């Protein structure tokens, strides 16, 4: 009788843990389904890393081409071309990699959720673009990089409501860096490079390690 009780105890315990594991699996599956339906999860860590590399390449080109003897108008035009080229390359890369990831995760890329995330990201970016044009027109060149960092950070925080919450922390980092740059004159390119180059690469690596490696 004692042996039967012992066997019954171990069987019941094993059944309990099996049911517990199944319950946890069910909870995780439900959580994944809810995230797919309420958040844009096709964000790619590689896209952030490549965006950072593009920014570093653009900053390097700027330091090699622009010299103290370069005319101010030529310098501004060249910097504008570099910034727009980096933005375009990063946007195209992010779009392609996000589309490829959406095919793997089963989330529709062209969905209402995607458009909402893009809209919340684009609105601060467009506003920042208008402010940057105004700065150029009034020749307040020293705060141009600060404004770019600040509004990009705001765009990330605003878009994080519809994607991974960690995107907001990247946005906060950009906002803090832009705020510091406002009071540190003469180092605009350095702060721009740290933000758009270093922060993107660091975030992309951490994002891959925390999210994508677990999914693969």
Question: Model-flagged regions — what are they?
Answer:
Residues 2-44:
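N-terminal juxtamembrane cytosolic/stromal segments of multi-pass membrane proteins
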Residues 39-128:
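Selected alpha-helical membrane-embedding segments in polytopic membrane proteins
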Residues 44-54, 82-87, 121, 145-148, ...:
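Hydrophobic alpha-helical transmembrane segments of polytopic
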Residues 52-62, 87-94, 125-129, 149-152, ...:
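Helical transmembrane-bundle signal
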Residues 61-78, 133-142, 184-188:
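Helix-coil boundary and interhelical linker segments in multi-pass alpha-helical membrane proteins
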Residues 69-70, 100-105, 135-139, 210-215:
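Membrane-interfacial segments
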Residues 108-167:
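Membrane-proximal helix-loop-helix units in multi-pass membrane proteins
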Residues 155-216:
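Terminal transmembrane helical module of multi-pass membrane proteins
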